[in-house]
């Protein structure tokens, strides 16, 4: 009946005529209308909804609305607040009725500059530290067959660290034995360095108290002192780009993906909105090269932009400054005496980036009767290379000076460097202290004038290998030497690497050297052959095989045998074993019947988190990975397996690089099935000289599965909610099956069947708390309960 009524209404000839006629109807009402639309600028939705007045094909909106979505104010014509955007030259407007948007395309240069960084900042994290100590040791013993002399040395480092800094001391103990003396012949302990260091990473400041090496400039000499040194050290922040990097400018008309290639290798990918952009901090190596940006828009259209560059790592960015200031006593007889110190001295050095193409350098050093001052600069010579120059003056006697000038250029295929340095006679600095002290005592120790020049050049020949050469000229008052060397390297078939060298001392002898090496890939190790020919025609050689001990532990070997006309060719053989707690090496070298023997043990003992960890030598920082007591868990450092955790769930990683944000991982596949963990990888950087504990929280969960039935032995309804005494929740599945997992399920579980009273399953005593497997319980009866406390 309802359908027939509708049909009757639709077919009635008078039905529509009886409807009220619209008054003043006109299509102009749709052409002249106020709309609420989202503005889309150059295909980028802005999320900005505003009132747009449409009059025919004209669209009016407020000037401020355009500025709010990124159009620069200076690009808009006129000064009126209300703008007809459809009438602006160079602007295209479309009304997108289905999405209630107004699409406005403007010239890209009307939009603000977008600054993008191609430098990876994601891996930086503030350096961390722990509280503990470290003892590095190296025990080395040698037996010389000919003299039958035995020598044992113990090299050590003791280090303690906390939030207050790092204290360390190093030294060596030596003891000699002779065949004609039954007791110890001689023993000596020599201290090397003892000092305290505190670093402030945020301010990039390093304070050193005790023994230290003055941080020199490229044209000055290092000096050992004992006192105080304060330095501004950029190495604490490897994420901070100190070198002026080229910027890449461009513009796009729509949202685009940019792919950055440096010398043909893809280094980064980033998204950019419409408008002009600049890519800052482009990562690259020193020298000349080419940066290419491929821009791909949403329709897949690509635009390629290329720009050459030249980069020098010796330059500082504009406004960047590094410095060091040192005061203390000059160290004498280092390595031979423990506590020999001379007169006091002061050294101050500074580098400052004046512009992105000019860095100024200065250094001054002084003691009671000696002052040395110098000034230098590093410059980018119009992207054609780097120029480095310096000049120093010493007030010794009638004053003497030194100057240096160098030029270098490097590209993918070619490199060139030239340097000359001249020192007048008796040019003294603090590094010449032993000679200076002898002069004060009336001894002959004058320094000769010295002129050193060198030229180095290299070229890559593509599939034909590479060629490099150098010329060295050293001229002194009473002697001189000039040396020329050439080296050609080429990759032969079967992965054999060949290197041919020619060294000629002009006016002296010439030596030709041929070297071949063959890596064995997955088999490990490599074989090598060296042939050496001298001017007299004598040809000598050496053949050998070497395999490093794996970083995660294992055996290494080194074998060598001389090849010459002498029947008693020298031989060498040593074996290395790397354990998780130390490294052992032993071997021999010499001729048959006259071998010298040696043995070495090197490692460390550290303390952190109240635990003691024997491990291999720690040269810088170290990390201790904790897996909450689970043993045998593989640990990776920078995607490489470095060992497994011990019986207490710890592994020491001894080669962490200070301030480098490294990735540490654990492999959870060997964990029990009911182990719960929140993460399997962490990123961390560690202060220089420190140890840090990286904890991976892991908990064993109790996993219970069961079938639940009611008092009539019927399975509980599908989807019935359940909650344990400790708050663990689950639901009833098919056939009454349910599963609970957690650290502690408690002693009972409450279930809430829909439309029925709650019921309770007692599980106390039915499971093992230490089990590492999923425990399947027998079918459990859920008993109705009215205990509100239990609910």
What are these regions (language model features)?
Residues 125-128, 152-164, 184-201, 342-356, ...:
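Feature captures outer-membrane beta-barrel proteins of Gram-negative bacteria and organelles
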Residues 3-242, 535-606, 614:
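Post-signal-peptide, soluble extracytosolic/periplasmic N-terminal scaffold domains
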Residues 135-139, 169-171, 207-209, 323-327, ...:
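Membrane-embedded beta-strand positions of outer-membrane beta-barrel proteins
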Residues 640-649, 726-737:
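Short, acidic Ser/Thr/Gly-rich low-complexity loop/linker segments typical of extracellular
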Residues 101-106, 311-318, 611, 680-700, ...:
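Extracellular beta-sheet/turn segments enriched in Thr/Pro/Gly and aliphatic residues
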Residues 39, 250, 623-627, 702-711:
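A short, amphipathic beta-strand motif
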Residues 30-37, 44-50, 629-640, 711-726:
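Short, ordered, surface-exposed loop/turn motifs in non-cytosolic proteins
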Residues 53-61, 282-288, 650-676, 688, ...:
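Short Pro-Gly-centered beta-turn/loop motif in secreted/extracellular proteins
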């Amino acid at each position: 009946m309802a359908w027939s009524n509708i049909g009757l209404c639709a077919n009635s000839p008078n039905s529509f005529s009886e409807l009220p006629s619209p008054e003043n109807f006109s299509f102009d009402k749709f052409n002249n209308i106020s709309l609420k639309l989202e503005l889309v600028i150059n295909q980028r939705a802005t999320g900005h909804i505003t009132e747009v007045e449409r009059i025919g094909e004209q669209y009016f909106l407020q000037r401020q609305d355009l500025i709010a979505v990124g159009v620069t104010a200076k690009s808009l014509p006129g000064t009126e607040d209300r703008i007809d955007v459809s009438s602006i030259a160079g602007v295209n407007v479309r009304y997108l009725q289905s999405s209630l948007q107004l699409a406005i395309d403007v010239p890209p240069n009307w939009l603000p500059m977008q600054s993008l960084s191609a430098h990876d900042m994601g891996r930086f994290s503030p350096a961390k530290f722990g509280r503990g100590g470290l003892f590095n040791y190296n025990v080395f013993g040698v037996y010389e067959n000919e003299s039958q002399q035995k020598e044992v040395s113990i090299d050590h480092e003791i280090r303690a660290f906390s939030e207050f800094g790092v204290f360390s001391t190093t030294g060596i103990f030596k003891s000699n034995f002779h065949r004609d003396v039954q007791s110890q012949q001689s023993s000596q302990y020599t201290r090397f360095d003892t000092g305290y260091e505190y670093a402030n990473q945020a301010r990039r400041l390093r304070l050193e108290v005790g023994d230290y090496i003055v941080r020199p400039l490229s044209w000055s000499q290092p000096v050992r002192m004992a006192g105080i040194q304060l330095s501004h050290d950029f190495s604490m922040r490897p994420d901070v780009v100190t070198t002026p990097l080229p910027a890449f400018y461009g513009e796009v008309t729509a949202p685009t993906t940019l792919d950055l290639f440096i010398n043909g290798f893809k280094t980064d990918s980033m998204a950019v909105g419409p408008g002009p952009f600049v890519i800052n901090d482009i990562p690259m190596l020193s020298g000349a090269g080419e940066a290419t940006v491929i821009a791909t828009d949403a329709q897949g259209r690509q635009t390629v932009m290329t720009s050459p560059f030249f980069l020098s790592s010796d330059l500082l960015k504009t406004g960047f400054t590094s410095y060091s200031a040192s005061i203390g006593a000059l160290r004498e007889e280092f390595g031979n005496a423990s506590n020999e110190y001379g007169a006091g001295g002061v050294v101050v050095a500074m580098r400052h980036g004046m512009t992105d193409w000019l860095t100024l350098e200065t250094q001054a050093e002084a003691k009671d009767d000696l002052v040395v001052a110098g000034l230098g600069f590093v410059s980018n010579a119009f992207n054609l290379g780097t120029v480095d120059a310096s000049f120093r003056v010493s007030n010794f006697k009638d004053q003497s000076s030194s100057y240096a000038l160098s030029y270098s250029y490097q590209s993918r295929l070619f490199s060139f460097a030239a340097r000359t340095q001249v020192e007048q006679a008796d040019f003294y600095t603090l590094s010449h202290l032993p000679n200076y002290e002898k002069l004060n005592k009336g001894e002959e120790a004058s320094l000769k004038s010295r002129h050193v020049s060198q030229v180095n050049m290299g070229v890559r020949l593509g599939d034909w290998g590479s060629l490099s050469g150098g010329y060295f000229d050293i001229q002194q008052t009473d002697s001189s030497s000039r040396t020329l060397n050439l080296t050609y390297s080429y990759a032969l078939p079967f992965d054999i690497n060949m290197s041919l060298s020619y060294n000629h001392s002009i006016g002296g002898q010439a030596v030709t050297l041929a070297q071949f090496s063959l890596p064995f890939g997955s088999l490990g190790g490599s074989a090598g052959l060296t042939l050496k020919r001298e001017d007299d025609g004598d040809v000598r050689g050496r053949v050998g095989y070497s395999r490093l001990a794996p970083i995660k532990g294992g055996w290494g070997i080194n074998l060598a045998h001389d090849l010459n006309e002498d029947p008693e060719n020298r031989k060498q053989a040593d074996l290395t074993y790397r354990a998780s707690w130390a490294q052992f090496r032993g071997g021999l070298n010499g001729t048959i019947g006259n071998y010298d023997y040696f043995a070495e043990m090197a490692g460390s003992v550290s303390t952190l988190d109240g635990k003691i960890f024997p491990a291999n030598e720690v040269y810088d920082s170290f990390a201790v990975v904790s897996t909450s007591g689970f043993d045998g868990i593989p640990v990776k450092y920078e995607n490489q397996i470095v060992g497994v955790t011990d019986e207490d769930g710890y592994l020491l990683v001894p080669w962490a690089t200070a301030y480098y944000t490294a990735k540490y991982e654990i492999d959870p596949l060997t964990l029990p099935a009911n182990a719960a963990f929140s993460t399997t990888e962490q990123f961390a950087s560690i202060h220089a000289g420190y140890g840090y504990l990286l904890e991976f929280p892991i908990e064993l969960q109790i996993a219970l599965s069961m079938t639940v039935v009611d008092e009539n032995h019927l399975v509980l309804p599908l989807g019935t909610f359940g909650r344990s005494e400790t708050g663990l929740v689950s639901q009833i599945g098919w056939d009454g099956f349910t599963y609970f997992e957690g650290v502690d399920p408690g002693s009972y579980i409450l279930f809430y069947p829909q439309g029925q009273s709650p019921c309770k399953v007692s599980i106390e005593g039915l499971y093992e708390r230490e089990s590492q497997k999923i425990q399947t319980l027998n079918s459990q009866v859920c008993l109705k309960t009215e205990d509100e406390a239990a609910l």
